[in-house]
Curated annotation (Swiss-Prot):
The keyword Disulfide bond applies. PANTHER family: KILLER CELL LECTIN-LIKE RECEPTOR SUBFAMILY B MEMBER 1. Homodimer; disulfide-linked. Interacts with tyrosine kinase LCK. It is a single-pass type II membrane protein. It comes from Rattus norvegicus. This is Killer cell lectin-like receptor subfamily B member 1A. The chain crosses the membrane at residues 44-63. Residues 93-212 form the C-type lectin domain. Disulfide bonds join 94-105, 122-210, 189-202.
Length: 223
C-alpha cells in the first residue's frame, strides 16, 4: 500500500500577505497644504479685517464723544470778545441774583449758617462753595462783601487724616494762593475776612459764597 505524501506549503499566499501588509493609501505630501502665496494672502486678509474692526470701534467712540461734548471753544471766544469790547464782566450772563466775574458766577448769602449747611445749600443750587482761584478773585470777593461785617465760608476744610487743608474738590491748598491764620483742629473750616483767611470751627455761623461755572449757552444763545 502506497503511503500518501502530503506536502504543506510554508510559503504564505500572496492574498494573505497582501491582507496583512497593505496600508491605507496616503495622500500626497502637498495635498493638504495651501500654496505659500495663498497662506500669505489669508494672513493679510485677517490682519486687514482686524484693523477695519478697530477703526470702526475708534470712529464710533469719537463720534459719541463729539456728540456729547458741548461746543465750548466758540463760547469762550465770544466771552473774550465781550470782555474786550465792553470791559465789564457784568455783561456776562449768570442766573438771577448771581454776579459774574471772569468765567464764574457767584452768589453771596444774606444769612449765616454752619459750614456743612452752606455746603449743602450750594449743592442745592447746582453749585459749590467758593474755590478761590487766585489772589485777584479773592480781592474781588472781599470788595463784594465789604459791607458785611461777617466772614464768609469757602470750600476749604482741614482733614485730620492727611493733616492738611483741602478744597472740596479734593485738591490740596496751595500756600501761594491762601495763607491760613489760626489753630487747625479736627473740625476746622476756612472763612475769609477782609484781611485774613481764618481757621475756625465748622460749627460756627457765617455767610457763604457759592460759585458755578459760567455756562456757554448763556452767550451762545444770543446772536
Amino acid at each position: 500500500m502506497d503511503t500518501a505524501r502530503v506536502y504543506l506549503s510554508l510559503k504564505p499566499s500572496k492574498t494573505a500577505a497582501g491582507a496583512q501588509c497593505v496600508s491605507p493609501p496616503s495622500l500626497p505630501p502637498d495635498a493638504c497644504r495651501c500654496p505659500r502665496s495663498h497662506r500669505l494672502a489669508l494672513k493679510l486678509s485677517c490682519a486687514g479685517l482686524i484693523l477695519l474692526v478697530l477703526a470702526l470701534v475708534g470712529m464710533s467712540i469719537l463720534v459719541r464723544v463729539l456728540v456729547q461734548k458741548p461746543s465750548v471753544e466758540p463760547c469762550r471766544v465770544l466771552i473774550q470778545e465781550n470782555l474786550s469790547k465792553t470791559g465789564s464782566p457784568a455783561k456776562l450772563k449768570c442766573p438771577k441774583d448771581w454776579l459774574s466775574h471772569r468765567d464764574k458766577c457767584f452768589h453771596v448769602s444774606q444769612t449765616s449758617i454752619t459750614w456743612k449747611e452752606s455746603l449743602a445749600d450750594c449743592g442745592g443750587k447746582g453749585a459749590t462753595l467758593l474755590l478761590v482761584q487766585d489772589q485777584e478773585e479773592l480781592r474781588f470777593l472781599r470788595n463784594l462783601t465789604k459791607r458785611i461785617s461777617s466772614s464768609f465760608w469757602i470750600g476749604l476744610s482741614y482733614t485730620l487724616s492727611d493733616e492738611n487743608w483741602k478744597w472740596i474738590n479734593g485738591s490740596t491748598l496751595n500756600s501761594d494762593v491762601l495763607s491760613i491764620t489760626g489753630d487747625t483742629e479736627k473740625d476746622s473750616c476756612a472763612s475769609v475776612s477782609q484781611d485774613k483767611v481764618l481757621s475756625e470751627s465748622c460749627d460756627s455761623d457765617n455767610i457763604w459764597v457759592c460759585q458755578k461755572e459760567l455756562k456757554c449757552e448763556c452767550m451762545c444763545n444770543d446772536s
